[in-house]
Amino acid sequence: SNNIVKEIRYIEYPNPSQDVIKKFLRDYIKWNFEEQAKLAAETFPNPTYEIIDEVVIVYYKVFINDQPPKLPLDHVDTLLSSFLFWEEQEFDTDNKKAKVKFEITNFRQDANVWVTWIVRDIGEGVLGHAHLGKGIVEVTLGDYNCDGSFQLYDVKSVETIMTHELGHSISLQHVTDQNNIMYASYTPSYAYCLLS
């Protein structure tokens, strides 16, 4: 017992998950588009397009919601990786080749897509939400499924969820191929949970 008193203990990598959820809950409306997500996507402007060398280029203007300061993981870079993933794809539509391009805007009213990261529960096993074709994209940063307390997903999981949800925002549906990013199911990994 005397040895325990003298023992110095520290945690090399403390789990910031609880601090993150507190940051999001302090100013709930600012960090969440919950009310806007209930509205119809028809209120968003349509993406624009042009045809270059017989390829339809569809332009999406994206508003990126602020995040609480000093989050432990970088999610904005995962969004940029998700943009790049879809911009590298070529689609067939109406017997024409099509590509997408994303442009970030600071003005919500100009955006076809609003992106935000959330910590609220959006349904059992639901990792994200997106309107089809235009509208809101919400990506959860964690859940309560690892050890019963809120735990953050790792960066790769958040990127995978974001890429999937952005796929919906450019009008892609779920597919049956389990190796496709648009497959309906995904099991995320945790950044800090000791039980994962």
What annotation goes with each model-predicted range?
Residues 1-2, 194-196:
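Short, intrinsically disordered, charge-balanced linker/junction segments flanking boundaries
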Residues 2-73, 87:
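Disordered inhibitory propeptide/activation segment of secreted metzincin zinc metalloprotease zymogens
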Residues 73-177:
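Metzincin-family zinc-dependent endopeptidase catalytic domain
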Residues 65-69, 144-148, 188-189:
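A short, flexible beta-alpha/helix-coil linker loop
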